[in-house]
């Protein structure tokens, strides 16, 4: 029967439909089941009987059982609030059934229903009706979010790695990375970006202590000096970072952890200009001065007869001790933490090598930042240096702070190592650096980045296993490997057995420079396994896999039209249909694949497989070459082989002559005559990571040209390194009287600085110790060029000048630039005068010229006129009349210019 509609006077009248709306029972869950009658009582819209689309088993019930009336959809746009019939099955079903039915309702069905009412909008959607039906059974978003961030995360940490995966809502590994600078936990929730800080998402009371405070909800109108006064009342402030003040947050770093605690307790929740401050302890990631090697010391090679009280007495003479702890092993080490990081530095310098009870103390810095973590050492390294330590039940964040050379993931904490994410739940664990916080020690092979947590593993000595001459791969910063579902022939995704030790993996990694094979591109690989990875290094069986540089965890982010490099899909390789490419096993007879690694940033998400355009291999060319005369597959000209910083004499071979030489038939080889890369622009980057990228030439080089280029680039690199060393400033050599140079280059000066500002900054520490200063000006941009030259009167004057400026930030303009010093090319006051007195600078305004100072007599320290030469050159296209105008406003220009790389460019 038709639905009743209330007229304005409350008298029910039958509704008259001009069109019928027929919906099959499968499509009307949650809707009123209309059974309309046309005018005259004749059904003219369908020849089918009603029984063909209406189920007799559905019993109608009154909507009065609901707490609120749910409207029916009526073609004339009015809604009924009484006597609306609903399916009784809606209330006989469980809540899960209700949602499952809703999910089974196709979107097209809903659109089909709404198409009959195109001109009228329904008063409420299906989601709104469900929300009314459910009521307040579920908590609101704020309560749920607070529970997840607060208790939920801590419970998951206690339960182990699997729970941590479920609750790691803010991990950037899964594609939530935003431009490479993402706060964890708290910062992502509040939408603040742009700081290189991993912030602990806990209240200041009871969280991991740190000397650095992350202060949110700061009024951007507050002056820096006011903030300095506010925080200095609790102790000496090491640094006050206010670059994010306009976004509502600042960073405060203290020397003494007690001062940070006092500030957090006193200021958390305090109103400052109408805003309630929110203060959290923070752990920095990219600032080495605030990240590690300060605050605490490891004491090694200590006689066991020395008690903790005696040690406390020895070390407390340098400063107040926060804690003294000792390991329980035979060769015990002692951990001593100072409240003040400055005291720890002094103790390290004063006590390292001190003989106590017939043994020389070996001290090493570490920075646990107030945690209760205490690592268990396996044994001494035999050299009295850093102890070896076990990795079981070890938080990676703590590992990174104790031993900065060990790669740690900032997403791992709470005493358990996060398991690798793969389809079969492999127990393999990995330490993967996400945000450039820590790097692998120099020479660490790629396979050493994978660590099995099922067996305690010791740190190897930094001699043999990490020898650069054996691995050919030096410091690999910013590589972010994530492991795919399959590595070689292991369906579990684990390239190592659970009992494989770190040393075994390191020994495997020593063969990395002999070559990699690209196995299992498509079809059946060497071991009959179907997958797509970069496989094992040579001279070993398939039971171990090498480092895989990408995963398919973020496959939804990749453009499938262009394809990925070695995707696991068996149907496509590099976006090319599989039937076009025969199965390929390895580059077996190819010469080494030379890879140039540059330091430009890669902007795709960490952990994502790089997108590779199809022009990488010309589809019109032959993909498989069987000619034994093939000259090899050479990507570009070789520069410095391997990763950044690697030795040029140890190239990283891809497709070595030795790679599976026994395999015949299906091999991929590219003849230099027909294998062409389109361009380095079209060729995407093969390796993930934030810093390294591939630099590939536009075509394959012939062998002679390749080695000629290699030799040329080697010589360039060697000469550049030698030149840098020539201008490096060594304070020890100055103190020993071995270096008598006096002219320095000051680099990384903020571009808004004027000569007057620079003089004021220098005179604050070193007034009267210099006789020449020159700050070059860029007249086009009306600002300084970022560096200056100064000549000290005596070489000994360099030492206090170095201590005052080198490595320090500039005070003005809130600049993040850090000053650095190097020797100038031209040395001495007389040589500098001779260099400039005939230059075009003499035609410029006096304020743009070099400045000379009296060094003796009553006028010592005052400026003296710069002598003019007899042959002054003119600057092309520039008249002297414009020089003053160019100079007057140069201090207001942008602070975004590039500085030179070393101290030998201008002078």
From Swiss-Prot:
It holds the Pfam family RRM_1. Residues 211-284, 295-368 form the RRM domain. Gene3D superfamilies: 3.30.70.330. SUPFAM superfamilies: RNA-binding domain, RBD (SSF54928). Residues 28-58, 856-907 are annotated as: Disordered. GO terms for biological process: meiotic cell cycle; positive regulation of growth; positive regulation of meiotic nuclear division. Residues 44-54, 883-894 have a biased composition (Polar residues). Disruption phenotype: Early flowering. Probable RNA-binding protein that plays a role in meiosis and vegetative growth. This is Protein MEI2-like 4. It comes from Arabidopsis thaliana (Mouse-ear cress).
């Amino acid at each position: 029967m038709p639905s009743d509609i209330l007229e304005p006077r409350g008298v029910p009248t039958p509704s008259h439909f001009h069109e019928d709306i027929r919906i099959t029972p499968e499509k009307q869950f949650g809707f009123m089941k209309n059974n309309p009658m046309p005018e005259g009582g004749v059904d003219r819209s369908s020849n089918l009987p009603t029984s063909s689309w209406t189920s007799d088993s559905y019993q109608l019930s009154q909507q009065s059982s609901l707490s609120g009336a749910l409207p029916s959809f009526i073609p004339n746009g009015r809604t009924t609030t009484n006597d609306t019939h609903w399916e009784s099955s809606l209330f006989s079903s469980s809540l899960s059934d209700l949602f499952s039915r809703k999910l089974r309702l196709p979107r097209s069905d809903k659109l089909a229903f709404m198409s009959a009412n195109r001109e009228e909008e329904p008063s409420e959607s299906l989601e709104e009706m469900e929300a009314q039906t459910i009521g307040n059974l579920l908590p609101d978003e704020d309560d749920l979010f607070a529970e997840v961030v607060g208790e939920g995360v801590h419970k998951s940490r206690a339960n182990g790695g699997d729970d941590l995966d479920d609750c790691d809502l803010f991990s950037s590994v899964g594609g939530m990375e935003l431009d490479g600078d993402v706060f964890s936990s708290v910062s992502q929730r509040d939408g603040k970006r742009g700081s290189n800080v991993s912030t602990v998402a806990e209240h200041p009371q009871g969280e991991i202590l740190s000397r650095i405070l992350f202060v949110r909800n700061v009024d951007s109108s507050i002056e820096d000096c006011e903030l300095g006064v506010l925080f200095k009342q609790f102790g000496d402030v090491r640094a006050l970072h206010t670059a994010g003040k306009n976004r509502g947050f600042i960073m405060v770093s203290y020397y003494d952890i007690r001062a940070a605690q006092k500030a957090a307790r006193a200021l958390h929740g305090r109103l400052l200009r109408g805003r309630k401050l929110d203060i959290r302890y923070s752990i920095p990631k990219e600032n080495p001065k605030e990240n590690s090697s300060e605050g605490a010391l490891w004491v090694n090679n200590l006689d066991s007869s020395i008690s903790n009280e005696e040690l406390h007495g020895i070390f407390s003479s340098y400063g107040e001790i926060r804690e003294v702890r000792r390991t329980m092993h035979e060769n015990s080490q002692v951990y001593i933490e100072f409240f003040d990081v400055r005291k720890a530095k002094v103790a390290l310098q004063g006590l390292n090598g001190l003989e106590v009870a017939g043994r020389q103390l070996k001290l090493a810095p570490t920075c646990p930042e107030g945690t209760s973590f205490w690592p268990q050492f396996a044994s001494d390294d035999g050299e009295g240096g850093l102890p070896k330590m076990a990795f079981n039940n070890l938080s990676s964040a703590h590992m990174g702070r104790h031993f900065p050379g060990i790669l740690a993931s900032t997403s791992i904490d709470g005493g358990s190592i996060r398991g690798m994410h793969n389809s079969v739940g492999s127990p393999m664990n990995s330490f993967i650096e996400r945000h450039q916080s820590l790097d692998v020690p120099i020479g660490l092979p790629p396979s050493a980045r994978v660590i099995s947590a099922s067996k305690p593993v010791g740190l190897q000595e930094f001699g043999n296993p990490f020898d650069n001459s054996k691995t050919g791969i030096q410091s690999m910063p910013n590589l972010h490997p994530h492991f795919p579902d399959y590595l070689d022939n292991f369906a579990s995704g684990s390239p190592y057995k659970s009992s494989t030790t770190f040393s075994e993996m390191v020994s495997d990694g020593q063969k990395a420079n002999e070559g990699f094979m690209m196995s299992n591109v498509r079809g059946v690989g060497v071991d009959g396994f179907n997958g797509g990875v970069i496989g094992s290094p040579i001279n070993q069986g398939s039971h171990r896999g090498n480092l895989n540089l990408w995963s398919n965890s973020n496959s939804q982010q990749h453009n499938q039209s262009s394809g990925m490099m070695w995707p696991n899909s068996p149907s496509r390789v590099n976006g090319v249909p599989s039937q076009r490419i025969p199965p390929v096993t390895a580059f077996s007879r190819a010469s080494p694949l030379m890879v140039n690694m540059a330091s430009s940033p890669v902007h795709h998400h960490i952990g994502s497989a790089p997108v590779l355009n199809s022009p990488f291999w010309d589809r019109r060319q032959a993909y498989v070459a069987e000619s034994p005369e093939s000259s090899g597959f050479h990507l570009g000209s070789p520069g410095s082989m391997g990763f950044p910083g690697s030795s040029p004499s140890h190239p990283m071979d891809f497709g070595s002559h030795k790679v599976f030489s026994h395999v015949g038939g299906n091999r991929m080889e590219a003849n230099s005559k027909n294998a062409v890369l389109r361009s380095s622009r079209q060729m995407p980057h093969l390796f993930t990571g934030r810093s390294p990228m591939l630099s590939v030439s536009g075509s394959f080089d012939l062998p002679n040209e390749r080695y000629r280029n290699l030799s040329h680039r080697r010589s360039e690199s060697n000469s550049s390194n030698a030149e840098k060393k020539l201008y490096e400033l060594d304070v020890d050599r100055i103190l020993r009287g071995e270096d008598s140079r006096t002219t320095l280059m000051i680099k990384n000066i903020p571009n808004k600085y004027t000569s007057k500002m620079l003089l004021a900054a220098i005179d604050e520490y070193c007034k009267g110790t210099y006789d020449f200063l020159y700050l070059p000006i860029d007249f086009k941009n009306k600002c300084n060029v970022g560096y200056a030259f100064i000549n000290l009167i005596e070489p000994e004057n360099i030492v206090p000048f170095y201590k005052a400026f080198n490595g320090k930030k500039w005070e003005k303009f809130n600049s993040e630039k850090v000053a650095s010093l190097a020797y100038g090319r031209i040395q001495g006051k007389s040589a500098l005068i001779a260099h400039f007195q005939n230059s075009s600078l003499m035609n410029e305004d006096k304020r743009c010229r070099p400045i000379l100072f009296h060094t003796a007599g009553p006028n010592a320290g005052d400026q003296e006129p710069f002598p003019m030469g007899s042959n002054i050159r003119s600057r092309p296209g520039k008249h002297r009349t414009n020089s003053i105008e160019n100079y007057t406003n140069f201090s207001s220009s942008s602070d975004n210019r590039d500085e030179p790389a070393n101290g030998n460019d201008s002078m």
